[in-house]
Amino acid sequence: MPKMKTHKGAAKRFKKTGSGKLKRSHAFTSHLFANKSQKQKRKLRKSAIVHSGDFKRIREMLTYKK
C-alpha cells in the first residue's frame, strides 16, 4: 500500500505545538487595513488554536507533521 500524502495546503497553514495542539493564524490579515480598527488589527496579529471540532480532520491531512 502506498504512503499517505501530506496535504500541502494544510501543512503551510498549521503548526503543531509542544502539547500536540494545532496553531493557526487568523484570516483577514493580508490587505485592506484602513477600514479595520486598531483593536481588530491587534487581535488578528496573535495566532489561535484550532477548535476540537476541526482538529481530527486537519490532523488526518497532516499525516507526518512533527
UniProtKB/Swiss-Prot annotation:
Q: Please list the GO biological process terms of this entry.
A: translation
Q: Where is this region: Disordered?
A: 1-48
One GO cellular component this record assigns the protein to is: cytosolic large ribosomal subunit
Q: Which domain of life is it from?
A: Bacteria
* Stretches with biased composition (Basic residues): 1-26, 38-48
Q: Tell me which UniProt keywords the record has, alphabetically.
A: Ribonucleoprotein, Ribosomal protein
Gene Ontology terms for molecular function: structural constituent of ribosome
Q: Name the family.
A: Belongs to the bacterial ribosomal protein bL35 family.
Quote the protein name from its UniProt record: Large ribosomal subunit protein bL35
